Amino acid sequence: MTDNRVENSSGRAARKLRLALMGPAFIAAIGYIDPGNFATNIQAGASFGYQLLWVVVWANLMAMLIQILSAKLGIATGKNLAEQIRDHYPRPVVWFYWVQAEIIAMATDLAEFIGAAIGFKLILGVSLLQGAVLTGIATFLILMLQRRGQKPLEKVIGGLLLFVAAAYIVELFFSQPDMAQLGKGMVIPALPNPEAVFLAAGVLGATIMPHVIYLHSSLTQHLHGGTRQQRYSATKWDVAIAMTIAGFVNLAMMATAAAAFHFSGHTGIADLDQAYLTLEPLLSHAAATVFGLSLVAAGLSSTVVGTLAGQVVMQGFVRFHIPLWVRRTITMLPSFIVILMGLDPTRILVMSQVLLSFGIALALVPLLIFTSNATLMGELVNTRRVKQVGWIIVVLVVALNIWLLVGTVMGLS
């Protein structure tokens, strides 16, 4: 009887700890459903139907492993990835890493900020510039929560993640995808032509986010409660739940685009405005509105996450700190320049995702090296199987990027 009571008590304590440590992965997961994903997934679904769904499935599984490794590094060492690189690599390498990480963070933020601005434009009927102003104001308000600590921000961003997931459940209901074809697309790999390879690289870039690899290790480095092993166990649950939601959203985006556009002959849908305007007559005004609202929610939350990641990168690599509002102001400028110059915002979104895919290996290689170091990690060091899978992911990413670069140079994409 006493043993049962102790067992129940320890079980409740474990669940309580798991709940208390839930949150960091939800902030990281928001980076996986940003407006760049909308643009890339819609274009892929409209152009190739369900044929590229397998890329989303595998990219999401890779992302799960990567985020677990990132979170584990913070738990085991009390330092984030940028700080570990600063401590272990020569100064020129550290400065190179800092510059490329800042460029990638800004490219990410460009996609996220413009995506939210497009969402405001679509649902409110304002200009893109006015939508950008609204986005700026909204992100400043959300960032103010950071003054109250990490938990309030986790709750708001987690809520926005769940809102986007709910929105895509509604979109699936409206679009009625062919479940047999959807299932086939998820499990049977296909790259029918060079354009599909280009979009597959974009999907990979949109799904595995370099800036959140840096951020997640920072979000877990100050976690308290339980042993390191217990914190790691709770974090695996956190990552599994958050990334499953993000993976569902990405699959639903592409499946909705395939069902609504590809199979109705609208295979040329390549921008978010066009997607919104085409959804209304094809499905309903409600479907188009839900799409616009989900775009705003994803854009606002992910641009906040991008700002936080940029701060982590700067502090970690070069020990330099600027107020969040200053960083937010600076990183908004490229978005306003793109809008004022009249550049195609959706093309900018897709190109930014391709750029991101080049930063994945640069973040992954040191992450794998550090998490495989028994001196640093102790009992949380990577197993041989994890090391093998990790290096396979690096090789795949690099190979896909070389293919993408060659294809782009030759004018195939």
From Swiss-Prot:
Coiled coil: none
A single GO cellular-component term on record: plasma membrane
Single GO MF annotation: cadmium ion transmembrane transporter activity
Membrane topology label: Multi-pass membrane protein
A single GO BP: iron ion transmembrane transport
InterPro entries linked to this entry: NRAMP_fam
Keywords assigned by UniProt, alphabetized: Cell inner membrane, Cell membrane, Ion transport, Iron, Manganese, Membrane, Symport, Transmembrane, Transmembrane helix, Transport
Subcellular location: Cell inner membrane
Sequence ranges on the Cytoplasmic membrane side: 1-19, 72-95, 146-155, 221-238, 298-327, 371-387
Function: H(+)-stimulated, divalent metal cation uptake system. Involved in manganese and iron uptake.
PANTHER family, A to Z: NATURAL RESISTANCE-ASSOCIATED MACROPHAGE PROTEIN 2, SOLUTE CARRIER PROTEIN FAMILY 11 MEMBER
Name this polypeptide is given: Divalent metal cation transporter MntH
